[in-house]
Amino acid sequence: MGRSYNEKDFEYHRHTFHHTHHPLSTHLPPQRFRKRVLSMDRRRKRKRKKKKTSMPPSDVTPTIHEVDEEEAESEIEGQCQAATPTEPSEELPQLSLGSEEDLAADLPLSSFHMESERPASSEETLPSPASMEEKEETQQPPDGGEHKDISNSFSPSPEAASMTTRGWFRRKPVHRLAGAQRTSYDLRERICIGSMTAMETAVYQKVPTDEAEAQMLASADLDDMKSHRFEDNPGVRRHLVKKSSRCQLPRSSNGSPPLSSLKRRKRMDKKTHEVFVELNELIVDKNQEMRWKERARWIKFEEDVEEETDRWGKPHVASLSFRSLLELRRTITHGAIMLDLDQSTLPGIAHLMVETMIISDQIRAEDRANVLRALLLKHSHPNDEKEGLFHRNHSVTSLGSFRHNHNHVHDTSLPLVSQDHEEMHDSKAAEHDKEKSLHPIPAEGHAASRSLKLLAKIPKDAEATVVLVGCVEFLEKPAMAFVRLNESILLESILEVPVPIRFIFVLLGPTQTNVDYHEIGRSFSTLMSDKNFHEVAYFADDRQDLLNGINEFLDCSIVIPPSDVEGKDLLKTVASFQKQMLRKRKERELKKCASTVTGAELETKDVNIEEQEEEDQFDVDPLKRSGIPFGGLIHDIRRRYPRYISDLKDALDTQCIAAVIFIYFAALSPTITFGGLLGEKTQGMMGVSELIISTATVGVLFSLLAGQPLLIIGFSGPLLVFEEAFYKFCQAQGFEYLTGRVWIGFWLIFIVLVIVAAEGSFLVRYISPFTQEIFAFLISLIFIYETFSKLIKVFQEHPLMMSYTSAAFKHSDQRGSSVIGEPILNQPNTALLSMVLMMGTFFTAFFLRKLRNSRFLGGKVRRVIGDFGIPISILISVLVDILIPDTYTQKLNVPSGFSVTSPDKRGWFISPFGDKQPFPVWMMGASVIPALLVFILIFMETQITTLIVSKKERRLMKGSGFHLDLLLIVTLGAICPLFGLPWLTAATVRSVTHVNALTVMSKATAPGEKPMIQEVKEQRVTGMCVAILVGLSIVMTDVLRHIPLAVLFGIFLYMGITSLTGIQLYERITLMVTPAKHHPDHVYVTKVKTWRMNMFTVIQLLCIVLLWVVKSTVASLAFPFILIMTVPLRRLILTRIFEERELAALDADEDSPNFDEDGRDEYNEIHMLV
């Protein structure tokens, strides 16, 4: 029966003097006796000269003297001084414990002599095999003298021998004395397995090393020797210390830097990588063969394999059981932790994992081969069977190379970690030898192409984590091992995609236990996908760091009570509660970092601040006033024009070609629509031809000179409203309409120069969503009203009658086109067909837009159809009109070739002093008032569009040009009236669509995660090409003449209604008639009382009513002035009615850009019109 130890034995051992054991470091030789590290050549030469002697077992018990450490050192010094100077003095071998050199090379065997020792005879000597080889190689000298050991430079006298023995005892630990048969100490023999300390089956229990020890030591001494040799006390006193879980690092020599500096340097060299986690479970397939099958994967969210269909499910947030997390923490507490393991092959990793499990008493030594065989089973993934003739490159590794090293006999003469594996650590060439690799990279085939889509979603520098869980029958209790490799390695047969592996987690156990291995594997996989625990896993120094990471994860986790949840609405508060916890967590981290800032960190922070200032030179606020005239303009020019060459080179991309085609149709449709309506409003003074030429000319010049060339210049609804109001004013006052526009243009140049010189673009900050929503809502109502008013006018001109006379058909030709000259009235079916064309165009464009965000067809097909919704709807309506030739419809009035809309009314040049009558002088000066009103409209639309495009979420790197763009648009627009061309502005929806078309989304986006912008093709070529193509459309006059005006009214209706749906004001109006229990969880609903929210909505509606009244009277020109007055209303009056908290919720620009192709809608991102 073996003796069992308890705490009393340990306490007795601590306080007993003759059982005191010093740390290993106290037994090292003094510094002057240590051997210098020699080169490999000199070391080989010395090895040939060495002779090892063996000492026979002594029949007489040797006397071991207990001396103080100071006395022993003084005796050693005296012994060294007594050495004969004629004999070559050799230093003692260096005893650097734990170094790689000592482990790789054989240590010299030092002989020693005891006081009662007699000369050894050949009959009594039992030499070791190593000593026998040495004797065969070494010949005895002719004089019969004894061979001198290299470590002993002289033959000592008995007194000297006693001194030598005592000195040697102080340098060598007493419990390492192995007697005559054991004259060497190999560091590898310190590695022992946990089963060696088992009391019942201990191989070394009370067994001395030689006969001398058996004679001299008592039972207590033998027990103490066993404790020192086979228990976990590496160089410490008898108090229990938990061993670090980090893999044993080689200790450096005296000349190397200290270990603390190495750890610090290693920590600085580390960096975290993106994560890819794969969970494999051990199963038995239909052929009764065991294999690893992939059950789930994590890039950011969890994706599970559906067992019935063997396909991937939708990504979701992993829901974990609290019990599995606690079991995981307990498993890591008692499992094997191997950090910074230096291995490059799966067999090598599996071998060390199994040995560590044996040492930590998790598995028996008899289970070594079974566990190793299980770890090296092949891996399967979903849809592997569907690959046909192209099979995966599985790892079918033979275990024969391991069986000869893993017999079940406890051969203690061999180290548990074989020399082959030690050499594998140092063989760099074998690590990169693809011919000898067990996991070659598969050739390009079906398997590689199948995983290409998933590989594109994983970041390039990602490192994988493999989680292996399963049940096995041969284990008695669960066994766990966690491995962090020193460097990531590519094991192609393990993962579904070729991603280098950095972490491996293994959990095997019997089926009888009440442990759910699958849930524990999911828990650890979710932990590794968590950003904070992922960093902990990279920088962990021991087991406790991992446990602290789990505790921190538990602190930020949410526990849902075990109740039946019916409906998703009951879980809505979980997301908001989670956000609050994460925000508090970040605040705690910031406070902790602020309180632990050291002087060195302050210095590095100063350096980082300087670097950040250098990087943010181009990110200076463009609306910040410099205090000097034209300071903002100069800043825009200095920032943008040096990048002019890159603006041209960046256009050499296929995505720019696709953007040109798309934006051309997106810009042409509104141009034709507004041109036709403008011709209707101005009685042909300006129409489609003028608008096409103006758009092309100004667009090309703006693209070449702009600070933000991604803006699309075009006509807009507010300008159309102003043109109609100014035309009515001139008709009522008897002024020439086109001449008045010329003088407005002159004043526009003066106004814009004053504003740009004063850096007045900063005023756009005061135009809040309160004003934008009023403006957009008013224009949408005007669009809708004008559409139905035109339809009513068609019904009035072509009423529905019971019968029609033959005279009604005399003004129509065979195709239904009108004969120019006199108006055509009372045409049969004209009103009905016009209504059908208008509503058909509207519904076609509207539902094609809805199709883009639906789940039908593929994503790219839906995007193309949705982007070209307006041209498709126009084409369909025109074809319907052509197929009904017997019914008259009013067509678009477009002249042939390069001509004005009404050549009989005007020419290409407009005289500033009047054409048919002199223009009044006082009106020349009074034109400053309408010029100021036009400038308000252009300023608002241009600057708000630039503000939307320049949002940080869009990641535009080349900046914006608030001052430069405003100067160019207003100046070019002021020159246009000299040629009878309309003013232009930055079209909001077209500009946002242009930027979206040039945005390159990152393909490395985890499933379920919001798409991230990789880059935006910021260049000048696409805008210029779009403008040129629009200008070339003037030759399409024969095609444009077939477009009925009713189709344009349908597009007008589409613009009005789609603009309303993206305005928050419209949503709050619907909430006024919606019960409170059905209100959505928006900020302006949850943070503001319902009646106060309704009051804010009513104030906006009153402003809209006032603007509508002004617009409907003779003072319609003043509606831009009334509109701009809503800015001081919001800043001065509403702040006295509402609290700042309420205004922040009601008047906040909370709409962030949506970059998801399936849900992107430009109308929902902006408050302005097309």
From Swiss-Prot:
Its main location: membrane. Residues 657-1170 are annotated as: Membrane (anion exchange). Gene3D superfamilies: Helical hairpin bin, Mannitol-specific EII, Chain A. The keyword Electron transport does not apply. Residues 246-259 have a biased composition (Polar residues). It is found in: Cell membrane. Disruption phenotype: Morpholino Slc4a3 knockdown in fish embryos results in significantly shortened duration of heart systolic contraction and reduced Q-T intervals, in association with increased ventricular intracellular pH. It catalyses: hydrogencarbonate(in) + chloride(out) = hydrogencarbonate(out) + chloride(in). Widely expressed at low levels. One of its GO terms (cellular component) is plasma membrane. It is a multi-pass membrane protein. Residues 1-656, 849-863 are cytoplasmic. This is Anion exchange protein 3. It comes from Danio rerio (Zebrafish).
